[in-house]
């Protein structure tokens, strides 16, 4: 806690002194200071919040001679403002009133109950249902000479309690952050290591928080173990320092222990297939190149019935295991689900899963004592549904070990379910303060207080009837309002009949309101009962939360099993709906894909042309040639995606597929200037190529698309040739090498492990039709001018390009020209100049095309469609007979 000198408070009111003390402990955080029904911000916090949230900035009086800037948000809508702020990378300290205004002398006691930061979100209103939020700490390890030898990473999903550690090489930091995607990154004060731009909100914390010895002990205390050997973390150093800082920070933001952080996973780079940032981006696993969430592999696969399954899918896609045994186990489960008997059908299972709540995040809030009443009722209803869900699984588990494990983990925690059933009302209110949360019969005292409060109506009816009889006033009424409480209302003309025991409470224009000793006694009892009932309910609810804490490990077990079951069922649904097959695996070097299809592109088009892809010890590099837009990049990406899907455990879009070991997937596809990093397009391209040449192994899958195109023709050709040779001679990796340098098609003559394949197309006049079929052998041309014409390049430009192309081809045939002169003018005849504006292609339309343009297929009857087909055939034959191409 920060200590301020007495001078700092001179001239300030007691309330502002209280605020300044709290603000001093959170100097870099916006303080939401509770005042009645609002959270107020003061001074510079108010100005900043007004700017970020579009709030009204006011100024009320002064404190110590300084005008007090103010801005506020209503407490019932605070979550929407918090969501906006954390998206902007801001942190907010929530300062609540914890004292009773009625008994407080001076300012009501307040304290910060939690700090909301981008990486420590747990409230459902602040979280995306299908995205995990990670808080990450990084600590650099140095040798005795002060040279950085590794970077220790610790990252925590506070909403679920999942904690992971890793130690990586310094040059792997960008790839690790791209994979983890942390929302907030903790680094030591004074550290010189720069966090890559766009990696996440960065927060500096005291360097001593990263002490390795203290961090190791803090980890042991958190996990309640004597040593970390059982977690495989015995050799970690800097990662333990990072974990210590992370746990300290997370606990401080929550203001309490992290009871649900009870396990640890140490990640090793050899455990998963390596995917660098460029590969994740180019394969569009969870985000398109345009930055949208769809269409991606994730959006295609995500038919999960629970949000837990959707989040697990995202994790699996970014963490494909290298060991095929994990994939085979998952695919075995998918097969069992597809072959399930009628009483345990996949549709019935998925229908049951749709009723399941987000147990994972509810458990996290339960551990932090922030679970709301409907969290608990959802948890109860989910646990109550587990026996029926297990019955559906029981008919399947004999065929799949992983389903057997999931089934066992879905055993509902009986004591936890009993407590939730007895304590929580069937349909509780959203907030405890509203009452109606604790079930009737759970607490006798609460039931009695509720009876008093809820029976007010009958008492008032009886009292009104008695008083009408006693006084003879037929229109006498007994009523209640929040300002004056209970009262007896008598119209002005009947006041002479009022008995002596009536005491005037309020005078109105046309009536008088009275109170009697009997009504006053009842009022005190009723209002007191209501207040006491709410207080009792709050105390009981807090006690229920405490009583549920021992069941957190069981809740986490159930959540994990539900997520896995849901994801496996989603994989089975995709396999059935999209005609996918189970891949096989071998220990031999090779990849065999028969009639493979790009899963995402196939879903976007009416017809997709399937293609084969084959690698082996004698076939390691495929030189892919063919026209632009012919499908080279699609073919390359589909090969990588099918391989990744296989190792994730999904079925794959192919007739059959078999994979040998794969350790990494690299892609060098497309590029753009890195303006922030000061790198040109070509520099980005060469940097990615260098990483591949340095790191690819015989078990790596490499996608190289048009390497060398960012420089001069001969430089690019020379680089492409040398890179292809290196990949064959030194890396010996599986390589898909797309190029427009037709000189490279001679490479198989030198390296038998290289093979030529091409994407086919056919010309029609000066037009082109892409067949998207992969065939053996090299292509004969690139059809670049035809593609340019399809793109809408003006006809005069196309004509000029054809002439210049002929000249360049003639020039390149000369053995005396070391480099093509792209800017020398070819000889052009005068008559050619005169017709430079002529159209590049004949503009006579084909009669069949004209006929097709006038047709609305939706208006055709079956017989009309058949007649039209014959008519179109006649037009085509007639047109060809007239000598047209």
Swiss-Prot record:
Ranges annotated as spanning the membrane: none
Single GO cellular component term: cytosol
UniProt binding sites for ATP: 626-633
Keyword hit for Lipid biosynthesis: no
Cited Pfam families: MutS_I, MutS_II, MutS_III, MutS_IV, MutS_V
Presence of keyword ATP-binding: yes
PROSITE patterns, per the entry: DNA_MISMATCH_REPAIR_2
Keyword line: ATP-binding, DNA damage, DNA repair, DNA-binding, Nucleotide-binding
SUPFAM superfamilies: DNA repair protein MutS, domain I (SSF55271), DNA repair protein MutS, domain II (SSF53150), DNA repair protein MutS, domain III (SSF48334), P-loop containing nucleoside triphosphate hydrolases (SSF52540)
Entry GO MF terms: ATP binding; ATP-dependent DNA damage sensor activity; damaged DNA binding; mismatched DNA binding
SMART domains per the UniProt record, alphabetical: MUTSac, MUTSd
A Gene Ontology BP annotation from the UniProt entry: mismatch repair
InterPro entries referenced in this protein's UniProt entry, alphabetically: DNA_mismatch_repair_MutS, DNA_mismatch_repair_MutS-lik_N, DNA_mismatch_repair_MutS/MSH, DNA_mismatch_repair_MutS_C, DNA_mismatch_repair_MutS_clamp, DNA_mismatch_repair_MutS_core, DNA_mismatch_repair_MutS_N, DNA_mismatch_repair_MutS_sf
Gene3D superfamilies listed in its UniProt record: 1.10.1420.10, 6.10.140.430, DNA repair protein MutS, domain I (3.40.1170.10), MutS, connector domain (3.30.420.110), P-loop containing nucleotide triphosphate hydrolases (3.40.50.300)
Family: Belongs to the DNA mismatch repair MutS family.
Function description: This protein is involved in the repair of mismatches in DNA. It is possible that it carries out the mismatch recognition step. This protein has a weak ATPase activity.
NCBIfam families: mutS1, PRK05399.1
Protein name as it appears in the record: DNA mismatch repair protein MutS
Organism of provenance: Burkholderia lata (strain ATCC 17760 / DSM 23089 / LMG 22485 / NCIMB 9086 / R18194 / 383)
Gene that specifies this protein: mutS
